[in-house]
Amino acid sequence: MSDLEALHVRAKALNLNGLLAHWGEAAAAGWLATLIDWEEQERTRRSLERRLRAAHIGRFKPLCDFDWTWPKRCDRAAFEALMSLDFLKDATNAILVGPNGVGKSTLARNIAHQALIHGHTVLFTSAGQLLSELAALDSDSALRRRLRHYAGPRLLVIDEVGYLSYSNRHADLLFELVSRRYEHNSTLVTTNRPFAEWREVFPNAACVVSLVDRLVHNAEVLAIEGESYRLKEAQERAEQRARQRRKAKS
């Protein structure tokens, strides 16, 4: 394929119909390749901005600022494998398990941002927000529409499963969503509870075993152990303020 033919293919992919209608004239111009480059770059930029707004990732600490020495246990190689996004190609899931404050949400947001940069659709939500929203819908048609909304993204991040307890209906709704996404799109879950304790998160729910089974099938489970980094930062801030007060008095 010649360079000019390759430019024609790119122009068709961009639906530049006006340019294509005058291709014979445009082909002789020295600016044709630059024009198509500009259009592709601008569409890529606008697509990323649109997907960033829709993803609701929020502000987060970039990996360059993450203290890998703080967790007592965290398989960095396994996390970096998740950052490669290979699990999205296979439509498998990822689970980050660990106590409060060890960086699960930060790591999940970095994976979500990486997926966005690479052109994937992403949606980030907390378990509480997701399940409260679904449970509040008062018609089957509205529920089906909202389930399709959450089933659609290439990556759905459900943060903070286990921080609250939920009813049987909440459990059924989560199972329905996970089932819709199963082997079609990837789901990333952060939780402070090992799976053996999920019956306490969804007490008396009959679907808990099936829910966990669908989530963990072929999933990458990354366990993180350690003390709360947020507590560490709070203690450091308190100590700094105390030093400043002592200095002001001296």
Question: Which stretches of residues belong to each language-model region?
Answer:
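Generic structural signal for secondary-structure transition and capping sites
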Residues: L16-L19, Q41, F87, L155, ...
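Clamp-loader machinery-focused feature within the broader ASCE/P-loop NTPase space
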Residues: L48-A81, K89
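Conserved phosphate/pyrophosphate-binding and hydrolysis machinery centered on Walker-type P-loop NTPases
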Residues: E25-A29, W38, H56-I57, T69-K72, ...
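Short, conserved catalytic/metal-binding motifs centered on acidic residues
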Residues: N15, F66, D159, L215
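Conserved P-loop
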Residues: C74-G152, R199-V201
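Extended, charged alpha-helical coiled-coil/arm scaffolds that mediate oligomerization and mechanical coupling
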Residues: S2-L7
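Interdomain "pre-motor" coupling segment immediately N-terminal to P-loop NTPase/helicase cores
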Residues: H8-R59
